[in-house]
Amino acid sequence: MGQKVHPHGLRVGVIKDWDAKWYADKKNFSDNLVEDNNIRNFVKKKVYAAGISKIEIERAGKRVKLNIYTAKPGMVIGKGGQGIEALKGELKNIVSDNKNILINIVEVKSAETDAQLMAENVAQQLEKRISFRRAMKQTIQRAMKSGIKGVKTACSGRLGGADIARTEFYHEGTIPLQTLRADIDYGFAEADTTYGKIGVKVWVYKGEVLPAKKEVKEEVNA
Protein backbone atom coordinates (compact mmCIF):
# COMPACT_ATOMS: atom_id res chain seq x y z
CA MET A 1 0.00 0.00 0.00
CA GLY A 2 1.19 3.51 -0.80
CA GLN A 3 1.78 5.63 2.29
CA LYS A 4 1.60 9.43 2.58
CA VAL A 5 4.67 11.39 3.63
CA HIS A 6 4.05 14.43 5.88
CA PRO A 7 3.51 17.34 3.43
CA HIS A 8 5.32 19.86 5.65
CA GLY A 9 8.37 17.65 6.28
CA LEU A 10 8.72 16.93 2.56
CA ARG A 11 8.86 20.67 1.75
CA VAL A 12 11.16 21.90 4.54
CA GLY A 13 14.07 23.71 2.93
CA VAL A 14 12.16 24.14 -0.34
CA ILE A 15 9.12 26.33 0.40
CA LYS A 16 8.52 25.57 4.11
CA ASP A 17 10.53 26.50 7.20
CA TRP A 18 11.31 24.64 10.45
CA ASP A 19 8.91 24.85 13.40
CA ALA A 20 11.88 24.64 15.79
CA LYS A 21 14.74 27.07 15.21
CA TRP A 22 17.74 26.32 17.41
CA TYR A 23 21.06 24.50 17.49
CA ALA A 24 22.29 22.17 20.23
CA ASP A 25 25.20 19.77 20.66
CA LYS A 26 24.71 16.01 21.11
CA LYS A 27 24.60 16.38 24.89
CA ASN A 28 21.64 18.80 24.98
CA PHE A 29 19.80 17.97 21.74
CA SER A 30 17.50 15.26 23.14
CA ASP A 31 16.66 17.36 26.24
CA ASN A 32 15.66 20.32 24.05
CA LEU A 33 13.60 18.07 21.77
CA VAL A 34 11.62 16.59 24.69
CA GLU A 35 11.23 20.08 26.20
CA ASP A 36 9.85 21.41 22.88
CA ASN A 37 7.31 18.58 22.77
CA ASN A 38 6.23 19.21 26.38
CA ILE A 39 5.86 22.96 25.69
CA ARG A 40 3.70 22.36 22.61
CA ASN A 41 1.48 19.80 24.37
CA PHE A 42 1.02 22.06 27.40
CA VAL A 43 0.18 25.24 25.44
CA LYS A 44 -2.17 23.34 23.11
CA LYS A 45 -4.03 21.81 26.07
CA LYS A 46 -4.09 25.05 28.10
CA VAL A 47 -5.57 27.30 25.38
CA TYR A 48 -7.22 24.71 23.11
CA ALA A 49 -10.38 26.83 22.78
CA ALA A 50 -8.33 29.65 21.20
CA GLY A 51 -7.70 27.55 18.08
CA ILE A 52 -3.93 27.00 18.03
CA SER A 53 -2.70 26.39 14.47
CA LYS A 54 1.00 25.88 15.22
CA ILE A 55 3.73 26.82 17.70
CA GLU A 56 7.21 27.84 16.54
CA ILE A 57 10.02 27.63 19.11
CA GLU A 58 13.24 29.64 18.88
CA ARG A 59 16.15 29.19 21.30
CA ALA A 60 19.20 31.40 21.80
CA GLY A 61 21.33 31.05 24.94
CA LYS A 62 19.09 31.40 28.00
CA ARG A 63 16.13 32.65 25.95
CA VAL A 64 13.16 30.65 24.63
CA LYS A 65 10.78 32.43 22.26
CA LEU A 66 7.36 30.99 21.33
CA ASN A 67 5.48 32.16 18.24
CA ILE A 68 1.90 31.01 18.84
CA TYR A 69 -0.36 31.09 15.75
CA THR A 70 -3.96 31.36 16.91
CA ALA A 71 -7.40 32.17 15.46
CA LYS A 72 -8.48 33.94 18.70
CA PRO A 73 -5.51 35.96 20.03
CA GLY A 74 -7.66 37.69 22.66
CA MET A 75 -8.25 34.38 24.48
CA VAL A 76 -4.50 33.75 24.76
CA ILE A 77 -3.50 37.32 25.68
CA GLY A 78 -6.26 37.78 28.27
CA LYS A 79 -7.38 41.02 29.93
CA GLY A 80 -4.43 43.41 30.04
CA GLY A 81 -2.03 40.61 29.10
CA GLN A 82 -2.86 38.51 32.17
CA GLY A 83 -3.28 35.36 30.08
CA ILE A 84 0.25 35.55 28.66
CA GLU A 85 1.80 36.26 32.08
CA ALA A 86 -0.02 33.26 33.59
CA LEU A 87 1.14 31.10 30.67
CA LYS A 88 4.76 32.24 31.15
CA GLY A 89 4.61 31.39 34.86
CA GLU A 90 3.39 27.84 34.19
CA LEU A 91 5.88 27.30 31.34
CA LYS A 92 8.77 28.06 33.73
CA ASN A 93 7.98 24.73 35.44
CA ILE A 94 8.52 22.94 32.10
CA VAL A 95 11.58 24.85 30.84
CA SER A 96 14.88 23.94 32.50
CA ASP A 97 17.72 26.21 33.75
CA ASN A 98 15.45 29.20 34.54
CA LYS A 99 15.40 30.32 30.93
CA ASN A 100 13.76 33.62 29.95
CA ILE A 101 10.46 32.93 28.13
CA LEU A 102 9.13 35.29 25.46
CA ILE A 103 5.69 34.77 23.88
CA ASN A 104 4.68 36.29 20.55
CA ILE A 105 1.05 35.94 19.42
CA VAL A 106 0.38 35.75 15.67
CA GLU A 107 -3.24 35.94 14.46
CA VAL A 108 -4.42 33.40 11.89
CA LYS A 109 -6.45 35.57 9.50
CA SER A 110 -8.48 32.81 7.82
CA ALA A 111 -9.38 29.87 10.09
CA GLU A 112 -11.51 28.37 7.27
CA THR A 113 -8.38 27.63 5.20
CA ASP A 114 -6.00 26.56 7.99
CA ALA A 115 -5.68 22.76 7.82
CA GLN A 116 -5.01 22.23 11.55
CA LEU A 117 -7.96 24.37 12.63
CA MET A 118 -10.19 22.68 10.03
CA ALA A 119 -9.24 19.22 11.37
CA GLU A 120 -9.93 20.30 14.96
CA ASN A 121 -13.29 21.77 13.90
CA VAL A 122 -14.34 18.45 12.31
CA ALA A 123 -13.16 16.55 15.41
CA GLN A 124 -15.21 18.82 17.70
CA GLN A 125 -18.31 18.24 15.57
CA LEU A 126 -17.80 14.45 15.72
CA GLU A 127 -17.63 14.68 19.53
CA LYS A 128 -21.01 16.45 19.43
CA ARG A 129 -22.44 13.42 17.56
CA ILE A 130 -22.78 15.28 14.24
CA SER A 131 -22.57 12.99 11.18
CA PHE A 132 -19.00 12.67 9.90
CA ARG A 133 -20.17 13.11 6.28
CA ARG A 134 -21.96 16.35 7.11
CA ALA A 135 -19.00 17.68 9.14
CA MET A 136 -16.49 16.90 6.38
CA LYS A 137 -18.63 18.30 3.53
CA GLN A 138 -19.44 21.54 5.38
CA THR A 139 -15.74 22.10 6.18
CA ILE A 140 -14.79 21.55 2.52
CA GLN A 141 -17.51 23.91 1.26
CA ARG A 142 -16.44 26.72 3.62
CA ALA A 143 -12.79 26.31 2.58
CA MET A 144 -13.52 26.31 -1.17
CA LYS A 145 -15.58 29.51 -0.82
CA SER A 146 -12.46 31.20 0.60
CA GLY A 147 -10.67 30.80 -2.74
CA ILE A 148 -8.24 27.91 -2.19
CA LYS A 149 -7.29 25.52 -5.02
CA GLY A 150 -8.25 22.23 -3.36
CA VAL A 151 -8.97 20.41 -0.09
CA LYS A 152 -9.10 16.77 1.01
CA THR A 153 -10.39 15.37 4.31
CA ALA A 154 -10.15 11.88 5.79
CA CYS A 155 -11.88 10.34 8.82
CA SER A 156 -10.63 7.02 10.25
CA GLY A 157 -12.16 4.86 12.96
CA ARG A 158 -15.53 3.42 13.95
CA LEU A 159 -17.48 5.88 11.84
CA GLY A 160 -21.13 6.16 12.88
CA GLY A 161 -20.55 3.49 15.53
CA ALA A 162 -19.83 0.75 12.98
CA ASP A 163 -18.34 -2.52 14.29
CA ILE A 164 -15.51 -2.46 11.74
CA ALA A 165 -13.27 0.61 11.56
CA ARG A 166 -12.76 2.19 8.15
CA THR A 167 -11.45 5.34 6.45
CA GLU A 168 -13.57 7.69 4.35
CA PHE A 169 -12.23 10.49 2.14
CA TYR A 170 -13.87 13.56 0.62
CA HIS A 171 -12.09 16.00 -1.64
CA GLU A 172 -12.72 18.93 -3.94
CA GLY A 173 -10.33 20.64 -6.35
CA THR A 174 -6.72 19.47 -6.83
CA ILE A 175 -4.21 18.24 -4.23
CA PRO A 176 -0.76 17.78 -5.88
CA LEU A 177 1.03 16.08 -2.95
CA GLN A 178 4.15 15.19 -4.96
CA THR A 179 4.79 18.69 -6.36
CA LEU A 180 7.36 20.31 -4.05
CA ARG A 181 6.51 23.87 -5.10
CA ALA A 182 2.82 23.27 -4.24
CA ASP A 183 1.87 24.99 -0.97
CA ILE A 184 0.15 22.13 0.88
CA ASP A 185 -1.09 22.75 4.43
CA TYR A 186 -1.72 19.64 6.55
CA GLY A 187 -3.59 19.18 9.81
CA PHE A 188 -4.43 16.26 12.11
CA ALA A 189 -6.81 15.97 15.07
CA GLU A 190 -8.47 13.23 17.12
CA ALA A 191 -12.09 13.04 18.25
CA ASP A 192 -12.90 11.16 21.47
CA THR A 193 -16.30 9.58 20.80
CA THR A 194 -18.28 6.98 22.76
CA TYR A 195 -17.14 4.38 20.20
CA GLY A 196 -13.44 5.24 20.55
CA LYS A 197 -11.06 7.64 18.85
CA ILE A 198 -11.64 8.92 15.32
CA GLY A 199 -8.68 10.41 13.46
CA VAL A 200 -9.24 13.44 11.22
CA LYS A 201 -6.75 14.52 8.54
CA VAL A 202 -7.00 17.59 6.31
CA TRP A 203 -4.89 18.59 3.28
CA VAL A 204 -5.30 22.11 1.84
CA TYR A 205 -3.75 23.25 -1.47
CA LYS A 206 -3.26 27.02 -1.59
CA GLY A 207 -1.45 27.35 -4.92
CA GLU A 208 2.13 27.16 -6.15
CA VAL A 209 5.03 28.93 -4.46
CA LEU A 210 8.25 29.43 -6.41
CA PRO A 211 11.26 28.85 -4.13
CA ALA A 212 13.59 31.84 -3.82
CA LYS A 213 16.55 31.48 -6.15
CA LYS A 214 19.97 31.78 -4.58
CA GLU A 215 22.25 34.13 -6.46
CA VAL A 216 25.43 32.46 -7.61
CA LYS A 217 28.33 34.86 -8.01
CA GLU A 218 30.83 33.79 -10.63
CA GLU A 219 34.40 34.71 -9.95
CA VAL A 220 36.36 35.60 -13.05
CA ASN A 221 40.08 35.13 -12.78
CA ALA A 222 41.70 38.03 -14.57
UniProtKB/Swiss-Prot annotation:
The keyword Transit peptide appears for this protein: no
Any single GO BP term: translation
GO terms for MF: mRNA binding; rRNA binding; structural constituent of ribosome
Family annotation (InterPro entries): KH_dom, KH_dom-like_a/b, KH_dom_type_2, KH_sf_prok-type, Ribosomal_S3_C_sf, Ribosomal_uS3_bac-typ, Ribosomal_uS3_C, Ribosomal_uS3_CS
KH type-2 domain span: 39-109
Gene Ontology terms: cellular component: cytosolic small ribosomal subunit
PROSITE patterns: KH_TYPE_2 (PS50823), RIBOSOMAL_S3 (PS00548)
Keywords: Ribonucleoprotein, Ribosomal protein, RNA-binding, rRNA-binding
Family (UniProt): Belongs to the universal ribosomal protein uS3 family.
Summary of the function given for this chain in its UniProt record: Binds the lower part of the 30S subunit head. Binds mRNA in the 70S ribosome, positioning it for translation.
Subunit structure: Part of the 30S ribosomal subunit. Forms a tight complex with proteins S10 and S14.
The protein, known as: Small ribosomal subunit protein uS3
Native source species: Clostridium tetani (strain Massachusetts / E88)
Phylogenetic lineage: Bacteria, Bacillati, Bacillota, Clostridia, Eubacteriales
